[in-house]
Structures are given as structure tokens and as C-alpha cells.
Amino acid sequence: MKVKPLGERLLIKPIIEEKKTAGGIVLPDAAKEKPMKAEIVEVGKLPEDCQLKVGDKVIYNKYSGTEIKIDDEDYIIIDVSDILAKIEE
């Protein structure tokens, strides 16, 4: 299924990093904080001065957006204004 965000919104896929304690214990999903890194999967109508595009990795406000499932994968539809930074590698 293809989802195209409307307005100044993005469809992002959270980047889940496996969390371990200092002792090497892997934490279950319920004990982890919500991720704040994601990859942009689809873009809506972005402002002209916006420097984001599909494939960019970003840091976003962890309590923003609407979580959705597409083909058993987790995604978030988020406003462009809730993107805090672009990760440049």
C-alpha cells in the first residue's frame, strides 16, 4: 500500500536501535524509550525553503505525529515543523 501525506507532512519510518544495558542485557521493547531517529519515506507538499527529501535521516520530537501500520511495518505521519534536525553522514 502506498501512503502520500497531505499538506506539510512527512511519512517517516522510525529507526529502531537495539538497546543494551552496560552489563550487556538486551532490553525488551516495552522498556525502551520511543525512538527519535527516522528515515523519510514519503513527503507531502513541503515549503520551498525546506531541505528535506525522501531518504533523509532525521531527528524528530518523540511525542509528535500519528503512528500507523502499513504492511505490518510501523510508520509515523508527522508535521514538517516537528522535525528537529537532519542527520548528515
Swiss-Prot record:
Stored Pfam families: Cpn10
Keywords from the named record: Chaperone, Cytoplasm
The keyword Cytoplasm appears for this protein: yes
Coiled-coil intervals: none
Gene Ontology MF: a single term: protein folding chaperone
Segments traversing the membrane: none
InterPro entries found in the cross-reference section: Chaperonin_GroES, Chaperonin_GroES_sf, Chaprnonin_Cpn10_CS, GroES-like_sf
Predominant localisation class: cytoplasm
Subcellular location, record wording: Cytoplasm
The UniProt record lists the keyword Chaperone: yes
BP-aspect Gene Ontology terms: chaperone cofactor-dependent protein refolding
CDD domains for this protein: cpn10
SUPFAM superfamilies found in the cross-reference section: GroES-like (SSF50129)
Domain of life, source organism: Bacteria
Quaternary structure note: Heptamer of 7 subunits arranged in a ring. Interacts with the chaperonin GroEL.
Family of the protein in this entry: Belongs to the GroES chaperonin family.
Annotated function: Together with the chaperonin GroEL, plays an essential role in assisting protein folding. The GroEL-GroES system forms a nano-cage that allows encapsulation of the non-native substrate proteins and provides a physical environment optimized to promote and accelerate protein folding. GroES binds to the apical surface of the GroEL ring, thereby capping the opening of the GroEL channel.
Protein name (database record): Co-chaperonin GroES
Organism, as annotated: Fervidobacterium nodosum (strain ATCC 35602 / DSM 5306 / Rt17-B1)
